[in-house]
């Protein structure tokens, strides 16, 4: 599957790849999804076919994530995606800029790309080149990461209310599970931020950008610098809430241990009483004395157990 875009009046317009394309020089972005397929075969225009074939057949160095060679500038960057369990995951996108055209190759749809392509009419390319388009995508990526951090903040506030209440111990399992999930997302956000920072620094170092794009790239770097402390605070807050939850759980466990001690005290007391070797013990002469003692021990242990179970203390 391909998404092909032309530049007209500094705006991007999607092209239907089955149509005849007459302005190949204005093609600025070819977005390839699942590039291992043979979808380029149905594109009728020979020159466009060669462009896409070039991108699919060129040898991409899988171990080097940022490099420049005769085929152009190459950047291998991470973006958020969702796996089959609808969990957030980091997936790779290959970027190549060759002859003024941006080629992107990815295995599936990413929220950032869908978001950007959905509102193309709002994106004005001032310089109208592939580098500006690449910076646009990284900016949208940062906006998405910012939204994720804000969502984590909101979720942590809700979890904080549950944990600090200290009265809903039965909900702590879910709270601790949610904290672990948020911590995992936080680490992936950090990886994305550092990865984007490296990619933009590489772009600045390897390409002589116009002054406006140089400033644009530096603004994105500054935004990353501002987001990193917020992401670090997420880890601090998660650690604090986890320790608080574990503290309440330990208190509850100690309380339950005390309750168990109380539960087994009555039958132990009864058993100890009838274990005394005194000569005068009327119950020893009763034919029903032993069964009565056993029943009394069972009832004295069972009654507190049922009561504590009813109170959700066990």
Curated annotation (Swiss-Prot):
Motif residue range(s): Probable selectivity filter: 275-277
Domain notes: The central ion permeation pathway is formed by the first transmembrane domain from each of the five subunits. Mg(2+) binding strengthens interactions between subunits and leads to the formation of a symmetrical homopentamer surrounding a closed ion permeation pathway. Low Mg(2+) concentrations trigger both a conformation change within each subunit and a loosening of the interactions between subunits. This results in an open ion conduction pathway. In addition, this results in a less symmetrical shape of the whole complex.
Record note on quaternary structure: Homopentamer. In the absence of Mg(2+), interactions between subunits are weakened, and dimers, trimers and tetramers can be observed in vitro.
Localisation: Cell inner membrane
Identification of the protein by name: Magnesium transport protein CorA
Keywords: Cell inner membrane, Cell membrane, Ion transport, Magnesium, Membrane, Transmembrane, Transmembrane helix, Transport
Organism name: Blochmanniella pennsylvanica (strain BPEN)
Any Pfam family the entry gives: CorA
Primary residence: membrane
Marked site positions, Essential for ion permeation: 254
UniProt-listed InterPro entries: CorA_cytoplasmic_dom, CorA_MIT, CorA_TM1_TM2, Mg/Co-transport_prot_CorA, MgTranspt_CorA/ZnTranspt_ZntB
TM spans (from-to): 256-276, 288-308
GO CC entries: plasma membrane
Function: Mediates influx of magnesium ions. Alternates between open and closed states. Activated by low cytoplasmic Mg(2+) levels. Inactive when cytoplasmic Mg(2+) levels are high.
Family named by the database record: Belongs to the CorA metal ion transporter (MIT) (TC 1.A.35) family.
Catalysed reactions listed for this entry: Mg(2+)(in) = Mg(2+)(out)
The organism's place on the tree of life at top rank: Bacteria
PANTHER family reported in the protein's UniProt record: MAGNESIUM TRANSPORT PROTEIN CORA
Keyword Metal-binding: no
Membrane topology: Multi-pass membrane protein
Keyword GTP-binding: no
């Amino acid at each position: 599957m391909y998404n092909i875009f032309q530049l007209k009046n500094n705006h991007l317009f999607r092209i239907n790849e089955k149509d005849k394309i007459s302005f190949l020089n204005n093609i600025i972005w070819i977005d390839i999804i699942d590039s291992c397929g043979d979808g380029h075969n149905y594109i009728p225009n020979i020159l466009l076919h060669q462009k896409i074939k070039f991108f699919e057949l060129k040898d991409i160095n899988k171990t080097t994530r940022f490099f420049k060679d005769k085929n152009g500038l190459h950047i291998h960057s991470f973006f958020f995606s969702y796996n089959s369990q609808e969990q957030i995951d980091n997936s790779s996108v290959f970027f190549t800029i060759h002859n003024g055209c941006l080629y992107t190759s990815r295995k599936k749809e990413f929220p950032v790309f869908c978001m950007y392509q959905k509102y193309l009419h709002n994106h004005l390319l001032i310089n109208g080149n592939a580098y500006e388009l690449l910076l646009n995508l990284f900016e949208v990526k940062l906006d998405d990461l910012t939204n994720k951090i804000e969502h984590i903040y909101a979720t942590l506030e809700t979890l904080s209310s549950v944990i600090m209440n200290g009265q809903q111990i039965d909900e702590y399992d879910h709270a601790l599970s949610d904290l672990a999930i948020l911590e995992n997302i936080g680490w992936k956000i950090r990886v994305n931020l550092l990865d984007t920072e490296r990619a933009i620094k590489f772009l600045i170092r390897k390409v002589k950008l116009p002054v406006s794009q140089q400033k644009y790239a530096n603004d994105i770097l500054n935004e990353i610098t501002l987001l990193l402390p917020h992401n670090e605070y997420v880890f601090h807050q998660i650690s604090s809430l986890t320790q608080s939850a574990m503290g309440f759980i330990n208190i509850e466990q100690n309380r339950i241990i005390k309750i168990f001690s109380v539960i087994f005290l009555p039958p132990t007391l009864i058993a100890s009483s009838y274990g005394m070797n005194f000569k005068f013990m009327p119950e020893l002469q009763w034919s029903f004395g032993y069964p009565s003692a056993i029943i009394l021990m069972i009832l004295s242990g069972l009654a507190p157990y049922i009561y504590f179970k009813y109170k959700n203390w066990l």
